[in-house]
């Protein structure tokens, strides 16, 4: 079968089909079990982070090195020509992509990755653009879910915390809607899942419901996906009241299925108590580690006709 991701821009999870997603997950699984060190040999990848990042940037760069490639780029846009000399993003992309085989970008502005693709001579991979999309986070989430559940089909998932501004839950809901998931949304009313996501799910015949507490749905879940309630969006007293409702402790896991796993895009603050870390349900650190394999798989597929 031809590789559908070869030379493709990866800008939004909505641009990828069920077949595309399965291919990345299967390739990530293969690379984790049987490492390859030649798939990016003689390839140079631009890693251009206009916004702070730890896990995404380091896992991308690790993925490139482990596949035999090289990385150029920056983690501090303040020292680039864009900041110092007023160069446009379009001009920067034109120049940088003339040096490289792929262009990985994180940018605070929504739509920056799609704009970059208009001026790039090589495939563009979106490593996060504002509150819009973060497709490679979704790919590592899917890989982690598949790794723990043995399937992506027909799973029951709860999303907890900031569902309004959290780009990870938007993309993951869109992706898993292709696999017949059932969703439980648990958040403050002010941070509820956006209408456009709910409308998309309804159009696809995907079941979802809204809840006030995790305990209501815990026995049903295959995956519990926690996110941080962002303190800066509330008054201090209101934040303390809201955040306290969405803190997970080990005691609350007593009714969970034995193989239920907890995921979190990290960083966590107070929303998962440290006593959860030692339970067999905690999988968020392994999830972060899977970022290397998911990004290896994506880079290998985008830059090789056959993998």
UniProtKB/Swiss-Prot annotation:
A GO cellular component annotation here is: cytosol
The record lists the catalysed reaction(s) as: carbamoyl phosphate + L-aspartate = N-carbamoyl-L-aspartate + phosphate + H(+)
Signal peptide: which range, if any? none
Q: Which GO terms describe its biological process?
A: 'de novo' pyrimidine nucleobase biosynthetic process; 'de novo' UMP biosynthetic process; amino acid metabolic process
Enzyme class at the top of the EC tree: transferase
Residue positions annotated to bind carbamoyl phosphate are: 55-56, 106, 134, 137, 266-267
GO terms (molecular function) for this protein are: amino acid binding; aspartate carbamoyltransferase activity
Q: Which UniProt keywords apply?
A: Pyrimidine biosynthesis, Transferase
Keyword Transferase in annotation: yes
For the keyword Transmembrane helix, the answer is no
Q: Which residues bind L-aspartate?
A: 85, 167, 228
EC number(s) per entry = 2.1.3.2
Pfam families assigned: OTCace, OTCace_N
Q: In which pathway does it act?
A: Pyrimidine metabolism; UMP biosynthesis via de novo pathway; (S)-dihydroorotate from bicarbonate: step 2/3
Q: Which PANTHER family match?
A: ASPARTATE CARBAMOYLTRANSFERASE, ORNITHINE CARBAMOYLTRANSFERASE, MITOCHONDRIAL
Subunit structure of this chain's protein: Heterododecamer (2C3:3R2) of six catalytic PyrB chains organized as two trimers (C3), and six regulatory PyrI chains organized as three dimers (R2).
Q: Give the UniProt family note.
A: Belongs to the aspartate/ornithine carbamoyltransferase superfamily. ATCase family.
UniProt xrefs under NCBIfam families: asp_carb_tr, PRK00856.1
This molecule's function is given as:
Catalyzes the condensation of carbamoyl phosphate and aspartate to form carbamoyl aspartate and inorganic phosphate, the committed step in the de novo pyrimidine nucleotide biosynthesis pathway.
Instruction: Please report the name of this protein according to its UniProt entry.
Output: Aspartate carbamoyltransferase catalytic subunit
What organism does this protein naturally occur in?
A: Tolumonas auensis (strain DSM 9187 / NBRC 110442 / TA 4)
Give the encoding gene's name: pyrB
């Amino acid at each position: 079968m031809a590789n559908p991701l070869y030379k493709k821009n990866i800008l939004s999870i909505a641009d990828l089909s069920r077949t595309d997603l399965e291919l990345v997950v299967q390739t990530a699984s293969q690379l984790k079990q049987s490492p390859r060190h030649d798939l990016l040999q003689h390839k140079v990848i631009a890693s251009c982070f206009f916004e702070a990042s730890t896990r995404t940037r380091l896992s991308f760069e690790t993925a490139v090195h482990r596949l035999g490639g090289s990385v150029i780029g920056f983690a501090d846009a303040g020292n680039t020509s864009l900041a110092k000399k007023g160069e446009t993003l379009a001009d920067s992309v034109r120049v940088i992509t003339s040096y490289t085989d792929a262009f990985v970008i994180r940018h605070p502005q929504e739509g920056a990755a799609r704009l970059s693709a208009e001026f790039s001579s090589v495939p563009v991979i979106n490593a996060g653009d504002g509150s819009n999309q973060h497709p490679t986070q979704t790919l590592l989430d899917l890989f982690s879910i598949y790794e723990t559940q043995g399937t992506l089909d027909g799973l029951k998932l709860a999303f907890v915390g900031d569902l309004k501004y959290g780009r990870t839950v938007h993309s993951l809901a869109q992706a898993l809607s292709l696999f017949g998931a059932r969703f439980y949304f648990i958040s403050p009313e002010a941070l509820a899942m956006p209408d456009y996501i709910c409308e998309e799910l309804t159009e696809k015949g995907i079941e979802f419901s809204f809840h006030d507490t995790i305990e209501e749905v815990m026995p049903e879940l295959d995956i519990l996906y926690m996110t941080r309630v962002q303190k800066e969006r509330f008054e201090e007293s209101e934040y303390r009241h809201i955040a306290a409702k969405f803190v997970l402790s080990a005691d609350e896991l007593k009714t969970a299925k034995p193989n239920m796993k907890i995921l979190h895009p990290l960083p966590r603050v107070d929303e998962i108590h440290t006593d959860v870390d030692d339970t067999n349900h905690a999988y968020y650190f392994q999830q972060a580690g899977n970022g290397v394999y998911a990004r290896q798989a994506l880079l290998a597929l985008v830059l090789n006709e056959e993998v």
